[in-house]
Amino acid sequence: MKKIISILLLAGVFAAGASVSFAADTAPKSVIHVVTVAFKEGTKPEQIAAMLEGVKKLPADYAGITHVWTNAIKVQNPEGAKVKKTHVIVMEFASEKALKDYTDSPAQKKWYELYLPIRDVSTTYDITN
């Protein structure tokens, strides 16, 4: 009987360790940088497309960016919003340091040449665990 209880306790300890390990695996330390954007009146679709292509090149231009997403499936604007945001850009940074170092980097400056002239307003969220 003691052997069975010991086995059950040991199994419980392994199960608890596995669940803690699984939780850690689902909580990465990368930083997700989410930008919702409204473009200036008169911005042409070609300008937006060029800006989005520039975003897609950022992981090659800046090692701290691991992934980007540019295809917003759904964009919600608050009821009565004066400026309607139409696009969402998401960049995944390897770490908080990578995000901080991106500020004023050559890669950011290059992308800003495409982005800032057409941006009306944007809201940014930086998220990590």
Regions from the language model: what does each represent?
Residues M1-I4:
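Positively charged n-region of N-terminal signal peptides that target proteins for export
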Residues V20-A24:
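Boundary at the C-terminal end of the N-terminal hydrophobic targeting segment
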Residues I7-G17:
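Bacterial N-terminal signal peptides
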Residues S30-F39, N71, Q76-T103:
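Short, well-ordered beta-strand segments in beta-rich or mixed alpha/beta enzyme
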Residues M51-L52, V68, E92:
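Non-catalytic interaction surface on structured domains
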Residues T26, P45, K57-I65, V83, ...:
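An amphipathic, aromatic/His-enriched active-site/gating alpha helix that lines ligand/cofactor pockets
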Residues V31-L58:
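N-terminal targeting signals for Sec/Tat export/insertion, comprising classic cleavable signal peptides
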Residues W69-K74, D126-T128:
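A general secondary-structure junction signal
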